[in-house]
């Protein structure tokens, strides 16, 4: 039965590889609880998906779009404007200058240790 179904589906989706991807997407949709457009007839989800594609009861465009969205790993985001980038680069350059200054201080034997404790000056009147 599946062979006949695949042969019918190839008429709708000529590329067999694309057919496998689309049918797999529809089978995952069915597993997730999507409503069936054909009777199950005790068939498993991939066979039901192929039957739906062969009978043209599901929109192929919607399945292709869902497939593309599920396979996308990189989502494009808006890039920051030039002014923001210039400010970021300037901040980064200042940070590198500070690191260089700290390295020079360490080479000279100087260090800054911030313990967070305040020094109290005793007046000696205890």
Swiss-Prot record:
Domain of life: Bacteria
Coiled coil: none
Keywords in alphabetical order: DNA-directed RNA polymerase, Nucleotidyltransferase, Transcription, Transferase
Keyword Transferase: yes
Protein name stated in the entry: DNA-directed RNA polymerase subunit omega
Gene3D superfamilies: 3.90.940.10
Entry's family note: Belongs to the RNA polymerase subunit omega family.
GO MF terms held by the record: DNA binding; DNA-directed RNA polymerase activity
Gene Ontology biological process: DNA-templated transcription
Cystine connections: none
Function: Promotes RNA polymerase assembly. Latches the N- and C-terminal regions of the beta' subunit thereby facilitating its interaction with the beta and alpha subunits.
């Amino acid at each position: 039965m599946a062979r006949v179904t695949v042969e019918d589906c190839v008429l709708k989706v000529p590329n067999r590889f694309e057919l496998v991807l689309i049918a797999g997407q529809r089978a995952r949709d069915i597993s997730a609880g999507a409503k069936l457009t054909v009777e199950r007839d005790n068939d498993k989800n991939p066979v039901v998906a192929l039957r739906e594609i062969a009978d043209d009861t599901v929109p192929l465009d919607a399945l292709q779009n869902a497939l593309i969205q599920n396979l996308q790993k990189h989502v494009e985001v808006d890039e920051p404007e030039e002014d923001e980038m210039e400010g970021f680069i300037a901040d980064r350059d200042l940070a590198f200058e500070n690191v260089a200054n700290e390295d020079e201080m360490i080479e000279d034997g100087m260090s800054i240790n911030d313990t967070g404790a305040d020094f109290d000056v005793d007046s000696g009147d205890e």
